Amino acid sequence: MPTTDSARAADIKQPDIKPRSRDVTDGLEKAAARGMLRAVGMGDEDFAKPQIGVASSWNEITPCNLSLDRLAKAVKEGVFAAGGYPLEFGTISVSDGISMGHEGMHFSLVSREVIADSVETVMQAERLDGSVLLAGCDKSLPGMLMAAARLDLASVFLYAGSILPGVAKLSDGSEREVTIIDAFEAVGACARGLMPREDVDAIERAICPGEGACGGMYTANTMASAAEALGMSLPGSAAPPATDRRRDGFARRSGQAVVELLRRGITARDILTKEAFENAIAVVMAFGGSTNAVLHLLAIAHEADVALSLDDFSRIGSKVPHLADVKPFGRHVMTDVDHIGGVPVMMKALLDAGLLNGDCLTVTGATVAQNLAAIAPPDPDGKVLRALSDPLHPTGGITILRGSLAPEGAVVKSAGFDSDVFEGTARVFDGERAALDALEDGTITKGDAVVIRYEGPKGGPGMREMLAITGAIKGAGLGKDVLLLTDGRFSGGTTGLCVGHIAPEAVDAGPIAFLRDGDRIRLDVANRVLDVLVDPAEFDSRRTGFTPPPPRYKTGVLAKYVKLVGSAAIGAVCG
């Protein structure tokens, strides 16, 4: 008797919609676990439903995360509507804007690892079947995506959304649209006598008019755009601001989507392929996004067991043009990107040019190309986003460097460079504070190459962002005349001539450890080279007797971190 189509379909094994939570709901021996779950609201009929972890980095410390409490409620509505049972739990988030320029910044990057570890811990311990991961601050976005990649469950990422721009009324009667970066730059301008204190106060009061992440194409918005390009968040969800009620709709649909992923047996690593990471890199390059995206995408790929390297960034950046006129180097903010159609506009333009892989799977269950066809985004508007025929720069906004000063690599945000070559005289500082003091004293001048070392992942520890010094340099009017180099990081809001992630770092006896005041340093962006112009034999002789400084922290999370963290060239991952 021939087999019918319906019989064949019945023989196909359907994915288990409860692949893990049966460990806590099924069988006589799970009576105690069911009793605990009844206390949080589950009833008899709920034990047959998939359990979805709703992981949120909501807190009251920073405006970046304030909307997440509201969005988590909408996510849970979506999970319920799709036939799942949501269980919300929290994790930490560190505010880079508040922790910048002091000891607190040592704890920023390690928070990425703590977030990933904490989400993994809860998801594994409670045997949750899938997750919706909500984040709003710089390190919480990659931390959540790292957790998704590590766990390889059905997962959807949801961004909190960016803040609206503020408007400062200045002492000369003018009004100026401002973001948080303007405050850092105002400090430098005021210190040099270029701005009155009352204008600094006006900017301070205007930069954060409400909830949401910092508004330019800084790290949070860059990583939200990357998450959308990776396929880990719903199409069109990166750009709407935090206060926009469209976000509640995205939240509900994210809750529905994760249950549908379970029904279809789609997990995070089905989405997080090498081609998906290449799509994310292309979008970051075209936006001229934060250099932190290099560090974070390498780390997420590591968790997904995808071979991604700095060479991939170089390869993609060499063929993807810089198209977005967005802050910190441009004129516009994320709300402007939203007004002209959001990240799908950029993705469709890149797809049409053959610079994006349209076959990559996404959390909708459809491919990138199918999603974009359904949205039908408009063409770039020509102002916020340029057409590929009229780019701001012919190559991507981030350049990977190598050379005698960075054998393993370094990163520069080339979107802000007016010329390809800078040659300057080294001014060497062990730590950011000493460099800030020199700038305030007026001893950093045009033509200097300011070197800030022992700020790497191990040496810092924590690879601090150098926004305080870069903002002060720009505010002092030296943004185009002073080169800054570090084994630390830069904020997504950094502008100026800034080279970071220099590897190997100083504490690992990288060449940056042996620079001296007066050495000549040459940066050639077009040829992707960073060199120290000292006779190699003489420079090598400086290594004799090198001893790195002792660890700054002997207890606590950073003491553990130093023992585990790897080079910035591989994402500063721990293991």
Curated annotation (Swiss-Prot):
[2Fe-2S] cluster binds at C64, C137, C214. Mg(2+) binds at D96, D138, K139, E465. The keyword Calcium does not apply. Binds 1 [2Fe-2S] cluster per subunit. This cluster acts as a Lewis acid cofactor. The keyword Magnesium applies. PROSITE patterns: ILVD_EDD_1, ILVD_EDD_2. The active site is at S491 (proton acceptor). GO terms for molecular function: 2 iron, 2 sulfur cluster binding; dihydroxy-acid dehydratase activity; magnesium ion binding. Transmembrane segments: none annotated. It comes from the Bacteria. One of its GO terms (biological process) is isoleucine biosynthetic process. It catalyses: (2R)-2,3-dihydroxy-3-methylbutanoate = 3-methyl-2-oxobutanoate + H2O; (2R,3R)-2,3-dihydroxy-3-methylpentanoate = (S)-3-methyl-2-oxopentanoate + H2O. The modification N6-carboxylysine is found at K139. Residues 8-25 have a biased composition (Basic and acidic residues). Pathway: Amino-acid biosynthesis; L-isoleucine biosynthesis; L-isoleucine from 2-oxobutanoate: step 3/4; Amino-acid biosynthesis; L-valine biosynthesis; L-valine from pyruvate: step 3/4. Its EC number is 4.2.1.9. Its cofactor is [2Fe-2S] cluster; Mg(2+). Keywords: 2Fe-2S, Amino-acid biosynthesis, Branched-chain amino acid biosynthesis, Iron, Iron-sulfur, Lyase, Magnesium, Metal-binding. SUPFAM superfamilies: IlvD/EDD N-terminal domain-like, LeuD/IlvD-like. Residues 1-25 are annotated as: Disordered. Functions in the biosynthesis of branched-chain amino acids. Catalyzes the dehydration of (2R,3R)-2,3-dihydroxy-3-methylpentanoate (2,3-dihydroxy-3-methylvalerate) into 2-oxo-3-methylpentanoate (2-oxo-3-methylvalerate) and of (2R)-2,3-dihydroxy-3-methylbutanoate (2,3-dihydroxyisovalerate) into 2-oxo-3-methylbutanoate (2-oxoisovalerate), the penultimate precursor to L-isoleucine and L-valine, respectively. Belongs to the IlvD/Edd family. Homodimer. This is Dihydroxy-acid dehydratase. The gene is ilvD.
